[in-house]
């Protein structure tokens, strides 16, 4: 599991920060295939943001095949491998 944190001063939209943190968590092995993510509501409360922001991040990642959402069960890391280029890794590490 990873700890989510938003940078209020970065200028990067919150949903994009969530997407980046999940992708980096998977690539770095901190999030494993099949691992359940916090519910939309729980993550929104934790980050003090609108649930629609979390929902958009999860939806974007689901469209990419990175997350699987199972109605009534939760959102899980897909078993599909995620490739992140070196430039993107450096950008994520700077955040």
Predicted regions and their residues:
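Short, Lys/Arg-rich nucleic-acid/phosphate-binding segment
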Residues: 37, 66-77
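A short alpha-helical element within helix-turn-helix/winged-helix DNA-binding domains
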Residues: 36-47, 61
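Short hinge/loop at the helix->beta-strand junction immediately C-terminal to the helix-turn-helix recognition helix
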Residues: 30-31, 60, 65-66
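Short, hydrophobic-biased segments on the C-terminal half of alpha helices
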Residues: 22, 58-59
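Extreme N-terminal segment that seeds HTH/winged-HTH DNA-binding domains in transcriptional regulators
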Residues: 1-36
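Conserved segment of winged-helix/HTH DNA-binding domains
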Residues: 81-95
């Amino acid at each position: 599991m990873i700890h989510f944190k938003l940078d209020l001063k970065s200028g990067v939209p919150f949903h994009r920060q969530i997407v980046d943190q999940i992708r980096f968590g998977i690539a770095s092995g901190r999030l494993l295939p099949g691992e359940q993510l916090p519910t939309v509501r729980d993550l929104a409360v934790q980050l003090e943001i609108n649930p629609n922001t979390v929902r958009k991040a999860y939806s974007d990642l689901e469209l990419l095949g990175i997350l699987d959402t199972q109605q009534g069960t939760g959102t899980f890391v897909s078993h599909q491998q995620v490739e992140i280029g070196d430039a993107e890794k450096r950008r994520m590490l700077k955040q």
